[in-house]
Amino acid sequence: GRVAGGHDGSRTPGGIKIKKGKLRGIESDGMMCSIEELGSSRDYYPDAPESGLYDMGQDAVVGSDAIEALGLHDVVFEYEITSNRVDCYSIIGIAREAAATFHKDFVLPDIKPTGNNENVNDMISVDVEDGDLCKRYCARMVKNIKLAPSPEWMQRRLAASGIRPINNIVDITNYVMEEYGQPMHAYDYDTIADHKIVVRRAKDKEVFCTLDGQDRTLDSSMLMICDGEKAIGLAGIMGGENSKITDDVKTMLFEAACFDGANIRISAKKAGLRTDASGKFEKGLDPYNAEAAINRACELIEELGAGEVVGGMVDVFPVKPEEKVLPFEPDKYNKLLGTDVSSDEMLKYFDKLEIEYNESDNTLHIPSFRQDLLRTCDMAEEVARFYGYDKIPVTLPSGESTSGKLSLIHISEPTRLL
């Protein structure tokens, strides 16, 4: 086999410097490496031995950079995103911001249509009993599932994001969550009683076993995903042990939904269970993102040969959110910031952010993914970001001092003392 070697002067991820030496009288110019000594782990390379050298395979070119051959040479950016910018908890969201910042065009990925001649609506029904807690529920189905390891490019990208690759189906859901910021869940279709999904509140003291094998005691404030007979998932947090994907799965139901953020946060705390999915849901997701995410997942399933996507989509969207419209108030923005930015310049900033201006009634139409833009000060903040914080003049707080009048207490106090 072909293995990686560290030469004299190289350092391991632990900081140990590799030096020339002699081993049993034979001169050694370096050290052959295990996967851990290359800065990775068996979590991301499950075929690596528990101890010993990692065989990189016959495709590895002798003399090439081992880190590059393993795909570990990629640059990883870490962003500290404030909780109000949930749209940036995804690759697409960061790309949108980067395009606006660097004056580039932002183009959403073109998702190819998927699905055979069957109709998913003939195979599953969805009933949302509480539209306030479940704003949208999208479902698609995949049959003839072929579980297998994901391709290396996907495993590497997941590993770079700190996610352990498992199999093609699980990896696709995680990959799309990173791309679109939309959590998804997969259920074994053959375990769904009556081929029916019901989104309802839990019953007080209802006990439910989650995927991690733990029994959770619920109450009526928590939202459940159920079939015709039983609960199969704790909405937005974790699926159930009774509907999990196993190696024997043949047909799968994909779920992409938009649950109420405050409810998910409270439910996760009550259940003592916080997951990557609940962490995203609790910040409040864009309901219009669910459809694109589930279609992207189905595109990847066909692309990777992981199964046959059934045509159509079940889409329950009880109450579509009203479009947010704010008045365009450039004078107020400048007053708040202490700047003198022209109206035209402000509108250029807003256009980059996909905020549409309606000249007829002087209003700004806020895109659904910008849930943080609610009032005048929020719009002023957007102006400040693109105008440049460094250009905003530094001024000290000022106020007008007046002598004022003495209160009755101050007037009467000297009299009393006399």
Stretches with model-predicted labels:
Residues 1-408, 412:
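RNA/tRNA-interacting regions in translation and RNA-turnover enzymes
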Residues 413-418:
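Short "domain-exit" segments at the C-terminal end of structured domains
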